[in-house]
């Protein structure tokens, strides 16, 4: 299948001020795309926009919060006003939480779902309407999920639950809009060298992430590597992007052998408890 041209295509990205979102924005600029960037940190968002322009693309920064429907509507309205329409959407906004289940409050559970899952739903709803209005465009919706959408690692149960929820919605949506020629892709990064683990530790009230220190190099990657895989998926759409092939096989095996997985996760939990004391 021939690769689709991304030149002048309009990509709306949430969570674009850092990490994977910022890396995808820059890669999109290098591919000649026009990137509409959303995030809560306006100064960082503007800095990313400058890097997109330096890479060869166009950029528009639209600060906002994906948990607020009015902000999401404003984001897509700004994209349409600036560039005439939207070709593709990457719902990337989200954060991590690294806490035992019995130490996680219901407020924390609801808050992470509000951003990671319901923020994604708001983005996808607006994004679906936008790409439907462009019959000649890329018509592509993408979601930054995670490898842990496949299982619940110790101390990451709340976070993993949001990613599993994203996956379920994306899978259903993929089937529902396939006949319209609209593509839906989920991205499943492993431990990515971004602010993620630092933020997860901060949200958990600790000064370091036990998950980060226990993640083998084989299951870590750079945001730039993930971004290159996202751009490749925009050119040649696929249902899922797993930037780490070893992780894909490992998580498939984990699903196939639940008893072995339970044993391995229990060992990991015991090791983290020992290190956390």
Regions found by a protein language model. Give the residues of each.
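Active-site helix of classical SDR
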Residues: 124, 162-165
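A short, exposed helix-loop element centered on a Lys and neighboring polar residues
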Residues: 124-125, 171
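Substrate-binding pocket helix/loop in short-chain dehydrogenase/reductase
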Residues: 100-101, 105-110
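Conserved glycine-rich cofactor-binding loop
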Residues: 17-18
């Amino acid at each position: 299948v021939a690769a689709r041209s991304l030149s002048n295509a309009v990509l709306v990205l949430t969570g674009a001020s850092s990490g994977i979102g910022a890396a995808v924005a820059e890669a999109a600029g290098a591919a000649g795309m026009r990137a509409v960037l959303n995030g809560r940190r306006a100064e960082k968002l503007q800095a990313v926009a400058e890097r997109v322009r330096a890479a060869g693309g166009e950029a528009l920064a639209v600060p906002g919060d994906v948990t607020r429907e009015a902000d999401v509507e404003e984001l897509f309205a700004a994209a349409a006003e600036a560039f005439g329409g939207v070709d593709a959407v990457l719902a990337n906004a989200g954060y991590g939480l690294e806490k035992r289940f019995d130490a996680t409050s219901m407020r924390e559970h609801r808050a992470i779902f509000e951003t990671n899952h319901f923020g994604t739903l708001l983005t996808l709803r607006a994004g679906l309407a936008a790409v439907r209005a462009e019959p000649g465009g890329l018509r592509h919706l993408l979601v930054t999920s995670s490898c842990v959408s496949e299982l619940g690692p110790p101390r990451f149960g709340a976070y993993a639950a949001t990613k599993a929820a994203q996956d379920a919605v994306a899978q259903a949506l993929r089937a529902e809009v396939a006949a319209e020629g609209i593509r839906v892709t989920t991205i499943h990064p492993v431990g990515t060298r971004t602010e993620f683990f630092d933020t997860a530790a901060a949200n958990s009230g600790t000064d370091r992430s036990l998950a980060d220190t226990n993640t083998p190099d084989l299951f870590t990657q750079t945001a730039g590597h993930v971004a290159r895989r996202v751009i490749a998926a925009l050119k040649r759409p696929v249902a899922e992007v797993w930037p780490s092939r070893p992780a894909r096989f490992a998580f498939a095996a984990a699903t196939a052998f639940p008893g072995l997985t339970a044993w391995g996760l229990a060992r990991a939990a015991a090791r983290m408890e020992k290190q956390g004391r």
